[in-house]
Amino acid sequence: MSKQLEQEIAKRRTFGIISHPDAGKTTLTEKLLLFGGAINMAGAVKSRKIERKATSDWMAIEQERGISVTTSVMKFTYREHEINLLDTPGHQDFSEDTYRVLTAVDSAIMVIDSAKGVEAQTEKLMEVCRMRNTPIITFINKLDREGMHPLDIMADIEDKLQIECAPLSWPIGMGKDFKGVYNIYQKRLHLFTPGTESIDGQGQMIEDLDDPLLDELLGRQAVELREDLELLAGAATPLEYDQYLSATQSPVFFGSAVNNFGVQEMLDAFIDMAPAPGPRMAVSREVLPSEENFSGFVFKIQANMDPAHRDRIAFFRICSGKFTRGMKVHHHRLGKDISLANATIFMAQERANVEEAWPGDIIGIHNHGTIKIGDTFSIKEPLKFTGIPNFAPEHFRRVILKNPLKMKQLQKGLIQLAEEGAIQVFRPIIGADYIMGAVGVLQFEVTMARLKNEYSVDAIYEPISYQAARWVSCEDKKALAEFEKKNQSTLARDSEGFLTHLAQSDWMLNFFMEKWPNIDFHKTRENI
């Protein structure tokens, strides 16, 4: 491994932020970008007084609704480290996209609303992180409002998420009595001034809790802080770095993202603790980031990031080696060499051409319909990275076109949106319908809005009586052909041509599975 490759890997941190909707994820993202100097003013998320839109929510429907429905990738520098931040969809209907994003990160920050504790979406996302043993740092947000007691929040996290909490900061009061946080990690007291947004995170050094300065600064709350910290010393588990890396323990920080309070302390700890890019599993072997040969995979495709150019960008995670502009790589699914001439790096809606990039970096590759989610590019050795699946949809709708002359545009729009993985599209073997499938119902609304805005297609959708879908396969081609011939009314092909069984109920699905025991019915389809 070259010295430069080693240094570049060591200074990279690639992470995602996960939370339930409205826990403050987008606000935290803005503040992190502010510290990184990537933006001059935090995006004033959901503020009516300030018309500026949140930097990471760039799609029209996101700006309208105030939720993140796609994933933004943002790069910034902090303390001589290169940070790649993946802002995941916060709405529960977009778990597929979030799952794929979590395949591209090395660690995550989990945001918890102090008034609500662990919520449903957080539990789902943690399941995904647990599957991959993704290290998690927890930020307990909104301490400037009334909420649960910090010990109760940690008990809630440990109980529902099965991960041990190791507090590295501790709040002093909450709501109207919120005075600040004591950083256990740095032995510093940070005082909170309501209505201000300080990005000076120095704080007051207090190494000895018996220091009279503590009483001077906090008054009666100094006694409470001493009692809390004494209780913690006996009850809370001290941080074990190996347990954090193996995702069995989470360092916990408290703060208020909207007031930019407690954010820098967490960011500093993140830089010190979060892992640099690590090994990745391919079908044939484990790939180390330090290998000289370039490799990586596509985890997301986004259409029309720039409506003026009708472009499609493939989001690509570099797993090993160095990327240089114009380099030739092998596109394994298609079995041909391509040149990566116009790769970009992201700062939400702002993009810049990239001359070189390293393991952990996320680059955008212009895609004219030939790149799919899960594709691997590499030099020399044919590699196929694993674990980037499609999920069987749980909700279905039939598409009805208002103007039949727009059929061509509808086909193009649905195929492109299906390539992004935001929606799945099926054509029944019998009939000319387009059937959309999704993990969550909001995806249908988003798809219709995007068809109208980006493809000038006016369409509506109506319920259809399917309740489950399974991809079908069989090693015995003859048996599969017989199955297809005898069950045409229940079969469709997805946008990539894979045979799919559509069932009207779980009972019907089980009936078919029992009737055809030699046919495999798959809940997920690995992107091949």
Curated annotation (Swiss-Prot):
Gene3D superfamilies: P-loop containing nucleotide triphosphate hydrolases (3.40.50.300), Peptide chain release factor 3, domain III (3.30.70.3280)
Domain tr-type G span(s) in chain numbering: 10-280
GO molecular function, one term: translation release factor activity, codon specific
Keyword Glycosyltransferase among UniProt keywords: no
InterPro entries: EF-G-like_DII, EFG_III/V, G_TR_CS, P-loop_NTPase, PrfC, RF3_C, RF3_dom_3_sf, RF3_GTP-bd
Residues given in the record as GTP binding sites: 19-26, 87-91, 141-144
GO-annotated cellular components: cytosol
Gene Ontology terms describing biological process: regulation of translational termination
Keyword list, A-Z: Cytoplasm, GTP-binding, Nucleotide-binding, Protein biosynthesis
Compartmental location: Cytoplasm
Chain's role: Increases the formation of ribosomal termination complexes and stimulates activities of RF-1 and RF-2. It binds guanine nucleotides and has strong preference for UGA stop codons. It may interact directly with the ribosome. The stimulation of RF-1 and RF-2 is significantly reduced by GTP and GDP, but not by GMP.
Family: Belongs to the TRAFAC class translation factor GTPase superfamily. Classic translation factor GTPase family. PrfC subfamily.
PANTHER family: PEPTIDE CHAIN RELEASE FACTOR RF3
Protein name: Peptide chain release factor 3
Source species: Desulfotalea psychrophila (strain LSv54 / DSM 12343)
Gene: prfC
